[in-house]
Amino acid sequence: MLSKQIPLGIYEKALPAGECWLERLQLAKTLGFDFVEMSVDETDDRLSRLDWSREQRLALVNAIVETGVRVPSMCLSAHRRFPLGSEDDAVRAQGLEIMRKAIQFAQDVGIRVIQLAGYDVYYQEANNETRRRFRDGLKESVEMASRAQVTLAMEIMDYPLMNSISKALGYAHYLNNPWFQLYPDIGNLSAWDNDVQMELQAGIGHIVAVHVKDTKPGVFKNVPFGEGVVDFERCFETLKQSGYCGPYLIEMWSETAEDPAAEVAKARDWVKARMAKAGMVEAA
């Protein structure tokens, strides 16, 4: 993995649902992926992972060692339900506790990057106070992450507060901390009125990973590859020419499909073909 190969991963929700990480990582290996990104979303089932016992955490670490497939990142979308910008003090406190537990979990199992959802609030009306609370919550979160040596990385979202790399960079400059970086989603970035290539270039030096999916304006999930507006070849070329050498993660939600593995294999081949056209020959 320290060669010039492009690290290519798959999102947990693309693979069959379940809690056996050995089976999940074995399937990812069979499908040719280097890593799997874990999801801790707003459902009680996935949130409960943050309360795993020592034995459960060790089982994940052992599965990683046995398969050679890493789990280097976590997509922490639980803050939709418990936002850091909430005006309800109890909800906000829960959001901060989820952050603390996620950072501790990451430290325990070797996760290096926690991808954050860029919502001040999601189910409520946003205002200046929710944005202030969100900024303060991020500051407190980054302090915790610094002590644990875990990187918090902001996703470029399906939401106006954080729908461009330029906006996320504003938070990076505000926090001014090496443990806060960016994790752009080229699908979300392309669905808004952004100069996508300029945005990607602006983020170089702060981008720690890239989500790969297709989108349409106003449609941010479950758009089949090749049917949306994303110019994948150009995005890959821009990132390569700008010096980005980090991981790419195919983001899909096919865990409930009739044959998730077949859906993932089809997407993998499609993405790798675009990578090869962009001159990322190691991915071909």
Swiss-Prot record:
<dbReference type="GO" id="GO:0016861">
    <property type="term" value="F:intramolecular oxidoreductase activity, interconverting aldoses and ketoses"/>
</dbReference>
<dbReference type="InterPro" id="IPR023492">
    <property type="entry name" value="L-Ru-5P_3-Epase_Enterobacteria"/>
</dbReference>
<comment type="similarity">
    <text>Belongs to the L-ribulose-5-phosphate 3-epimerase family.</text>
</comment>
<comment type="pathway">
    <text>Cofactor degradation; L-ascorbate degradation; D-xylulose 5-phosphate from L-ascorbate: step 3/4.</text>
</comment>
<dbReference type="GO" id="GO:0034015">
    <property type="term" value="F:L-ribulose-5-phosphate 3-epimerase activity"/>
</dbReference>
<keyword id="KW-0413">Isomerase</keyword>
<dbReference type="InterPro" id="IPR004560">
    <property type="entry name" value="L-Ru-5P_3-Epase"/>
</dbReference>
<dbReference type="Pfam" id="PF01261">
    <property type="entry name" value="AP_endonuc_2"/>
</dbReference>
<comment type="function">
    <text>Catalyzes the isomerization of L-xylulose-5-phosphate to L-ribulose-5-phosphate. Is involved in the anaerobic L-ascorbate utilization.</text>
</comment>
<dbReference type="InterPro" id="IPR050417">
    <property type="entry name" value="Sugar_Epim/Isomerase"/>
</dbReference>
<dbReference type="InterPro" id="IPR013022">
    <property type="entry name" value="Xyl_isomerase-like_TIM-brl"/>
</dbReference>
<protein>
    <recommendedName>
        <fullName>L-ribulose-5-phosphate 3-epimerase UlaE</fullName>
        <ecNumber>5.1.3.22</ecNumber>
    </recommendedName>
</protein>
<dbReference type="InterPro" id="IPR036237">
    <property type="entry name" value="Xyl_isomerase-like_sf"/>
</dbReference>
<dbReference type="GO" id="GO:0019854">
    <property type="term" value="P:L-ascorbic acid catabolic process"/>
</dbReference>
